Amino acid sequence: DEGHSEPSPVWREIVRQSDAIKVVITATPYRNDLFELNVDLDDYFIFTFKQAISDKIITEPNFIQVNSMEKMLQEVQLFLEKNENIKCIIKCKDAYDISRYHESISKKFKTVSIHETFRNDEASGKFKSVNSALKSDNIRVLIHQHKLDEGVDLPEAKLLVLTYQVGSGRELVQTIGRVVRNYNSIEPMIIDLASSSNERMWQSYRVFDDYISTPSGSKGFIKSLSTTNLIKGFLDNFPEYSYFSSRFRERLDLQSINANDISIPLASVCFIEKGPNYSTPLLLDKIYWELHTQGSLVKEIKNDH
């Protein structure tokens, strides 16, 4: 799934054992991607929101702050009447709010609402399935909670209504991403009913995007995705000698560890017998990647013991 993690243990082993070059493509590199496939910190490319605007692929959205459903309905009506064949997406926090907004706006525009608790009912305009909902003709408004956040292609959607404060920056970026693609030169608009909290979070994202648009910012961001790299950086900058836990101590140098200095309690060794398909390199590889995926700093030491 976009390089976040391998979908099955079998697939994971195949990927690990392959010497082929691996290219990971993801729109959300915020979930330990570097742990999963051991991405090279020197070989990467970031296509930012800022660059996509410059390349005229997407357009920066405009925000409008409103404080009532009545005012929101007025803005939606103005936008949709001005722009024929354009659709509006309304994001609600639960099924109750979806039904409430559906009742109000369906009086003016052809509306479909989608939620896991609904049944596919063409007559009422409420659906459980996105595909079933999109089969309806002449839709102008789509109301949902999470169903349209990703995996849905609606280039004609240029108006987004956020009825509540979205919980995370990643979810907000995905949601706004539904309406920013260039389409018929229409500027996307966001109607925010959450006292500008969504707009402020969006501006924080744009500051972040500007930061990773620079060479130093992008390199720092890529490095920060790996806890292993952060731990190593901390150790590298730690004093060579220091005093803590009532002892004078020398900094641990992982590059010069002597395997003979490592003592493993025999009670912790539970290796009893080998199966017919046992492989020591594969066992070590599994242990290495399990620890690496958890964010541990792991070093493989090859010796003759």
What residue ranges belong to the model's regions?
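Walker B catalytic acidic pair
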Residues: 1-2, 147
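Post-DEXD/H (motif II) to motif III coupling segment of the RecA-like Helicase ATP-binding lobe
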Residues: 4-57
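Short glycine-/polar-rich loops that comprise or flank the Walker A/P-loop
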Residues: 19-21, 57-61, 109, 155-159, ...
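Conserved interdomain linker/interface between the two RecA-like ATPase lobes of SF2 helicase motors
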Residues: 41-100
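Conserved helicase motor "Helicase C" RecA-like lobe of SF1/SF2 P-loop NTPases
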Residues: 95-115
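Conserved RecA-like P-loop NTPase helicase motor core
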Residues: 119-218
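Long, hydrophobic alpha-helical segments
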Residues: 185-276
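Accessory helical-bundle/CTD segments and flexible terminal tails appended to RecA-like ATPase motors
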Residues: 259-305
